[in-house]
Amino acid sequence: MLSGLIQRFEEEKMKHNQERVEELSLVRVDDAISQPPRYAPSAPMPSSMPTVALEILDKAMSNTTGATQTQKAEKAAFASYAEAFRDDVRLRQIKRHVNEQILPKLKSDLGGLKKKRAIIHMTLLIAAVVALLTSVCTLSSDMSVAFKLNGTSAEIPQWFKSLNPMLGVVNVGATFLMMVCAKSERSLNQQIDMIKKEVMKKQSYNDAVRMSFTEFSSVPLDGFELPLT
């Protein structure tokens, strides 16, 4: 009887140990917190173009308002570079092709305006000389100025004094022509400056698009970061 109890105890002990091993081999859901595997980030980094564009605009606006045409052209170039960094790649290429088509026309218009300004400026100088001569002649006739030639006094002849009304009309016409030419030249200067600014902007935009990746290293023009090796 004692041996039977010992044998039964051994069987129950073996059965208990086997159940314990099976219980430990099971994975409980609440005990094991599963996490997804970690992968290296493969998505492109956020574009840094807006930041670069803001820095360029800050550079353009940091100085005082350009008092000279050179300073204004510099600010226009900065603005074009900032625009190139801000635009999308497709829009950038479209603008570059449009600029290449418009630039020859702008340069042609600029040359024509410069020639027109040169003609108007020459007309202004001629009108100024005519106005000065007629003013001197009219003033001399009115004051009856006498000239000394070889020790003898010579007065202005009477027939020359009769030309005073005509000289006065010529003087008024020359003065009016001077005013018109000066106003036209001022308007042409504004148009020329505006076209020069547009040419500078479009050329700067195209230069920014054509820049190579090596010139910007980690900040290329294609809109995303490049890893530095």
Curated annotation (Swiss-Prot):
This is Non-structural protein P8. Pfam families: Orbi_NS3. It is a multi-pass membrane protein. The gene is Segment-10. InterPro entries: Orbi_NS3. It comes from the Viruses. One of its GO terms (biological process) is symbiont-mediated suppression of host innate immune response. Belongs to the orbivirus NS3 family. Plays a role in the inhibition of host innate immune response. Interacts with host OPTN and thus inhibits the recruitment of TBK1 to the host Golgi apparatus. In turn, downstream partner IRF3 cannot be activated and IFN-beta production is impaired. Facilitates viral particle release either by increasing plasma membrane permeability through a viroporin-like activity or by viral budding. It is found in: Host cell membrane; Host Golgi apparatus. The keyword Isomerase does not apply. Coiled coil: none annotated. Keywords: Host cell membrane, Host Golgi apparatus, Host membrane, Host-virus interaction, Inhibition of host innate immune response by virus, Membrane, Transmembrane, Transmembrane helix, Viral immunoevasion. The chain crosses the membrane at residues 119-139, 162-182. GO terms for cellular component: host cell Golgi apparatus; host cell plasma membrane; membrane. It comes from Bluetongue virus 2 (isolate USA) (BTV 2). Forms homooligomers via coiled-coil motif. Interacts with host OPTN; this interaction inhibits innate immune response.
